[in-house]
């Protein structure tokens, strides 16, 4: 008889799991943790069937599970109703970063611990942000489509192609990912790097960016915190979103906020899809208010085939830089978050509960971070 059940919900790898053994984040490869879990005397149940609620395999198996592990890239939504139907549930683990798929208030009420592998994919996401910015501002899609379609219209591409140099670029959120985006942007000699966050960056972090810009670009004091979001987006040529999803950020980028942005600005979102109102963003791209929107996160995952972000575009067909949710799940990131999940489970199985402080989202009925809510 097992000590308890661990429910693992991941995306299906299919033939790709056979071709690439490092694809740990798929259901076939199980984060490489099956043997470890079974050695601890626990049962591991795996599934890809997470929807619809309340008739999915997740609903059935969660009822007597002690631990549930899921991922931001294919999230099983641990809703209030699902928590109410799972009396044995004690630990929710996110294989990656971002735990908004868990009803954190309901978890607090039940004193369920929610953890994630903080830092596991911050470099991966920051690199994807940079790639998306460059795809948009350099009109990569326009040139690529001509190349594969047998065309050669240089002017048709160049009329929508710009440099990052001398641009004002901003981030909503300047945490582990947002700061790494700012670090990488310094190399492009921006005019200003702006950030909007509930707390100011440490002076040392700001000085590091300013000094690097002064040394390599001859331009100092480029980093500035902006108190009002509307003021920041009004100045910015490129806006990137790098903050968690919570009640105050849900639907933040709507028609009203977008109206404050520069005409022809670019918006990049690798945080959470629901931070943006899908229809409002699509309309802004279509009208030309936004020159482009890119990212990899969707308000529902997997996104339905008729999601407006799949087909949104501008008159020149170069305004869409969307991908599926891949920014934080490179093979390197998968190795890091698989090991992080194992470390969290080891802390739980040993009854030491000595999780890394930065990995704890809620514990003992209260928030352990201000990223999703105020400490109580």
From Swiss-Prot:
Q: Where in the cell is it found?
A: Cytoplasm
Instruction: Give a Pfam family name.
Output: 2-Hacid_dh_C
One GO biological process from the UniProt record?
A: formate catabolic process
Q: Which residues bind substrate?
A: 97, 121
Per the annotation, which location comes first and is thus the protein's main one?
Answer: cytoplasm
The UniProt entry, under InterPro entries, shows: D-isomer_2_OHA_DH_cat_dom, D-isomer_DH_CS, D-isomer_DH_NAD-bd, FDH_NAD-dep, NAD(P)-bd_dom_sf
What GO cellular-component annotations does this UniProt entry give?
Answer: cytosol
Which GO terms label this protein's molecular function in UniProt? formate dehydrogenase (NAD+) activity; NAD binding; oxidoreductase activity, acting on the CH-OH group of donors, NAD or NADP as acceptor
Gene3D superfamilies to which the protein is assigned, alphabetical? NAD(P)-binding Rossmann-like Domain
What upregulates this protein?
Induced by formate.
What reaction does this catalyse? formate + NAD(+) = CO2 + NADH
The record's keywords, sorted A to Z, are:
Cytoplasm, NAD, Oxidoreductase
What are the EC numbers? 1.17.1.9
Binding of NAD(+) occurs at 176-177, 197, 244-248, 270, 296, 325-328
Question: Which residues bear the site annotation Important for catalytic activity?
Answer: 272, 325
Question: Is Cytoplasm found in the keyword set?
Answer: yes
How would you summarize the oligomeric state and partners of this protein?
Homodimer.
Family under the similarity heading: Belongs to the D-isomer specific 2-hydroxyacid dehydrogenase family. FDH subfamily.
Protein role: Catalyzes the NAD(+)-dependent oxidation of formate to carbon dioxide. Formate oxidation is the final step in the methanol oxidation pathway in methylotrophic microorganisms. Has a role in the detoxification of exogenous formate in non-methylotrophic organisms.
> Which NCBIfam families does the record associate with it?
PRK07574.1
PANTHER family, alphabetized: FORMATE DEHYDROGENASE 1
Q: What is this protein called?
A: Formate dehydrogenase 2
Query: Taxonomically, what lineage is the organism?
Result: Eukaryota, Fungi, Dikarya, Ascomycota, Saccharomycotina
């Amino acid at each position: 008889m097992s000590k308890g059940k661990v429910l693992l919900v991941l995306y299906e790898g299919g033939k790709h799991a056979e071709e690439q053994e490092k694809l740990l984040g798929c259901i076939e490869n199980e984060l490489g943790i099956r043997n470890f879990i079974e050695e601890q005397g626990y049962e591991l149940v795996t599934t890809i069937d997470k929807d619809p609620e309340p008739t999915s395999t997740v609903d059935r198996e969660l009822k007597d599970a002690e631990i549930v592990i899921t991922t931001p890239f294919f999230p099983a939504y641990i809703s209030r109703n699902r928590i109410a139907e799972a009396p044995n549930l004690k630990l929710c683990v996110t294989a990656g970063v971002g735990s908004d798929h868990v009803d954190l208030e309901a978890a607090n009420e039940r004193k369920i611990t929610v953890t994630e592998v903080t830092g596991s994919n911050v470099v991966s996401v920051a690199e994807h942000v940079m790639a998306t910015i460059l795809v948009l501002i350099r009109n990569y899609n326009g040139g690529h489509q001509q190349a594969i379609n047998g065309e050669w219209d240089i002017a048709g591409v160049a009329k929508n192609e710009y440099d990052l140099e001398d641009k004002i670029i901003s981030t909503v959120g300047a945490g582990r990912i947002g700061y790494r985006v700012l670090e990488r942007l310094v190399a492009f000699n921006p005019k200003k790097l702006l950030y909007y966050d509930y707390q100011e960056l440490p002076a040392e972090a700001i000085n590091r960016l300013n000094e690097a810009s002064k040394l390599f670009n001859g331009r100092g004091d480029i980093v500035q915190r902006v108190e009002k979001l509307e003021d920041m987006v009004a100045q910015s040529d490129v806006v990137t979103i790098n903050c968690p999803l919570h009640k105050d950020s849900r639907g933040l980028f709507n028609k009203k906020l977008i109206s404050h942005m520069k005409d022809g600005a670019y918006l990049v979102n690798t945080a959470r899809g629901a931070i943006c109102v899908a229809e409002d963003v699509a309309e802004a791209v279509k009208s030309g208010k936004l020159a482009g929107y890119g990212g990899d996160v969707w308000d529902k995952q997997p996104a339905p085939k008729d999601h407006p972000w799949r087909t949104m575009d501008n008159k020149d067909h170069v305004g869409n830089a969307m991908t599926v949710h891949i920014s934080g799940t490179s093979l390197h990131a998968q190795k890091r978050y698989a090991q992080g999940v194992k470390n969290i489970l080891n802390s739980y199985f040993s009854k030491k509960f000595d999780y890394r402080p930065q990995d704890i989202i809620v514990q003992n009925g209260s928030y352990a971070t201000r990223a999703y809510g105020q400490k109580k």
